[in-house]
């Protein structure tokens, strides 16, 4: 039974060109995140391949120093995301992004818009160098 399910998954991945979509939309997503880095000092680095991406949050971009735990940056950012309509798991100062392989560029734009707004709000509350 599990082999049949695996074969069906492979069939769907091939039929819907999900590998190509992951590469194309992943590159677009990463470029959008790099644009956010230009506008938000809180972003120390953006890295990844395809749709597996990470955004590192820092208090000082030059030294890549994180935030003191008592600032609860991850918890506060999670709250900002929820307030702005995005459910996102932030467990540390690294946002790990792994959306579905079928994500579209317009959906990426929506996510990036909320990231932009939420990071902007958080940046006004914490000291960033």
Each predicted region: which residue ranges?
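Conserved N-terminal phosphate-binding loop of PLP-dependent enzymes in the Aspartate aminotransferase
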Residues: 1-129
């Amino acid at each position: 039974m599990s082999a049949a399910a695996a074969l069906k998954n492979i069939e769907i991945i091939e039929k819907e060109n999900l590998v190509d979509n992951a590469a194309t939309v992943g590159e677009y997503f990463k470029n959008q995140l790099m644009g956010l880095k230009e506008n938000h000092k809180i972003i120390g680095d953006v890295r990844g391949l395809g749709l597996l991406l990470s955004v590192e949050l820092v208090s000082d971009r030059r030294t890549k120093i994180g935030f003191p735990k008592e600032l609860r940056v991850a918890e506060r950012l999670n709250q900002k995301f929820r307030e702005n309509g995005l459910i996102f798991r932030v467990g540390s100062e690294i946002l790990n992004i792994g959306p579905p392989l079928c994500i579209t560029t317009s959906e990426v734009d929506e996510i990036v818009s909320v990231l932009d707004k939420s990071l902007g709000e958080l940046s006004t509350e914490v000291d960033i160098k």
